[in-house]
Amino acid sequence: MNIIKRILRVIVRTAIYLYCKVVYRLKVIGKENIPKEGPVIYCGNHRSYLDPPLIVVTAGRHVRFMAKEELTKNKFLKFLGYVFDAIYVKRDNKEIAALKTTLKALKNKESIAMFPEGTRNGLEKGESVKEGVAFFVLQTGAKVQPVGIVGGEKPFK
């Protein structure tokens, strides 16, 4: 990784962490249970656009995340994807590149954040849970770290 990207990652991680700590009174419970090494899939509920960066800044290790490709249309979200090495998924077809990239990352002992709902508040919208987490665990033996994201609707509360 180049030095500029490293510096950007530190700056952006710090900014997001401080923002969440001050505005949303961020509290992490059970951080001692997060594996320090080996492939890990952070499996969480998906409530807002802040969820992927929130996992990234609280995990204590580098975490990539899967995201719908349409997010690259927003310059800020595209920038976050670049900084945190997002894996973009084309959701409207049977694209295999994202699967291969994720498998390779997990086999290289990297960590990935995934949201089985497949979209924000998917279960509330009647969506079914996607099978991606189970597929990647069976293929790679990655550990699953459950993530529950609560609150965030009302800043400063």
PLM-predicted stretches and their roles:
Residues K5-L8, R13, C20-K157:
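Soluble catalytic domains of membrane acyltransferases
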Residues M1-I3:
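Short, Lys/Arg-rich, polar N-terminal cytosolic tail immediately upstream
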